[in-house]
């Protein structure tokens, strides 16, 4: 009996020891392993694929905090505008770790195949933020330019990085050919919501003063992130979001979960995709000049689904686009991604009478 009790005590002792020692040991192993992978992504993004795994999130976070050049914060890339705060300059050389590009603009927006040719007829307008503008690709590689090379109508690309829907509409409305444009493709991003909500709440955007513009021009890319930066950031995410962190480590769920979901506001309160869709439609309704135009809306799948599933005006048509190929660190579509987006947009437009009319392809 005494030997049996002694054996039970030994087993219980080892169980307690493992219960006490194993969790911090496993956490330390996870911290080190994730940090090593994230640092390798940061140093050698070409070795890795873009994903929502925790190591990709960490690498991208630190890339934008320390290393990335921001197009609209570079004085050679933007100029002051008294209505939009900033607009593209005539062009600049824009370089980051994963690309080196030349962006050229005219009064017709980012240069496309048709903006350099004698295309005639009602133009097809593209409005959006950095994805439409073509952050990370050259002029002839944007999806708007690729579409321009495959259709017989003029294609004008008015995308500008970090514009919300409000400024996107203001920009195209000021163009001389806006009255004759019958079709507009508008690309939506989750970060458009703040600008749209502010406009709807206050009735206008903050005054675009020269002082605010000067505040945008910053010195980015001050230093390279080092391994200690990676470890500290990894530890912070593991401490603040243990469930999401380990779910991503073991491949059970992409990171983020709720706490880091793009559908959460800066205050941390949940936001349904229907709020984005409703704000987007309300902004469009505020511009009566759009009433006689066909508006094709593309963006994240949940946003497009909310748009398609709700009540919307008869001139608004959702477009589903699968964003598959992105830069590993930079989180913008790469050259292949733009080719795929162009193909999908054309396929979507060709499926409807309204879309075919915009492409001048008959009934």
Give the positions of each predicted feature.
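Conserved SGNH/GDSL esterase-like catalytic core that processes O-acyl groups on lipids
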Residues: 133-209, 332
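Short hydrophobic segments within beta-strands
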Residues: 127-128, 187, 298
């Amino acid at each position: 009996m005494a030997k049996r009790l002694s054996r039970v005590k030994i087993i219980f002792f080892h169980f307690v020891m493992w219960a006490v020692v194993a969790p911090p040991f496993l956490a330390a192993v996870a911290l080190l392993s994730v940090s090593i992978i994230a640092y390798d992504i940061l140093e050698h993004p070409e070795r890795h694929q873009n994903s929502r795994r925790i190591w990709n999130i960490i690498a991208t976070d630190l890339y934008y905090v320390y290393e990335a050049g921001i197009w609209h914060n570079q004085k050679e890339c933007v100029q002051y505008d008294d209505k939009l705060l900033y607009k593209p300059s005539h062009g600049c050389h824009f370089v980051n770790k994963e690309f080196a590009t030349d962006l050229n603009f005219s009064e017709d927006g980012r240069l496309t195949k048709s903006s350099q040719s004698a295309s005639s007829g009602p133009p097809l307008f593209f409005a959006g933020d950095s994805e439409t503008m073509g952050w990370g690709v050259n002029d002839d590689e944007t999806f708007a330019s690729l579409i321009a090379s495959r259709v017989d109508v003029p294609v004008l690309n008015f995308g500008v990085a970090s514009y919300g829907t409000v400024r996107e509409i203001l920009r195209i409305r000021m163009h001389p050919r806006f009255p004759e444009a019958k079709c507009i493709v508008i690309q939506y991003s989750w970060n458009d919501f703040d600008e749209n909500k502010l406009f709807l709440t206050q009735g206008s955007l903050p005054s675009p003063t020269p002082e605010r513009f000067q505040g945008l021009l910053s010195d980015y890319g001050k230093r390279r992130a080092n391994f200690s930066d990676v470890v500290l950031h990894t530890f912070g995410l593991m401490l603040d979001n243990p469930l999401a962190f380990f779910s991503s480590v073991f491949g059970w769920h992409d990171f983020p979960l709720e706490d880091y979901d793009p559908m959460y506001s800066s205050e941390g309160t949940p936001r349904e995709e229907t709020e984005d869709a409703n704000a987007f439609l309300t902004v469009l309704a505020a511009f009566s000049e759009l009433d006689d135009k066909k508006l094709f809306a593309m963006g994240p799948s949940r946003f497009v689904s909310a748009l398609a599933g709700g009540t919307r005006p008869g001139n608004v048509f959702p477009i589903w686009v699968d964003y598959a190929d992105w830069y590993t660190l930079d989180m913008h579509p790469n050259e292949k991604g733009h080719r795929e987006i162009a193909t999908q947009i054309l396929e979507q437009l060709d499926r409807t009478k309204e879309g075919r009319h915009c492409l001048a392809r008959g009934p």
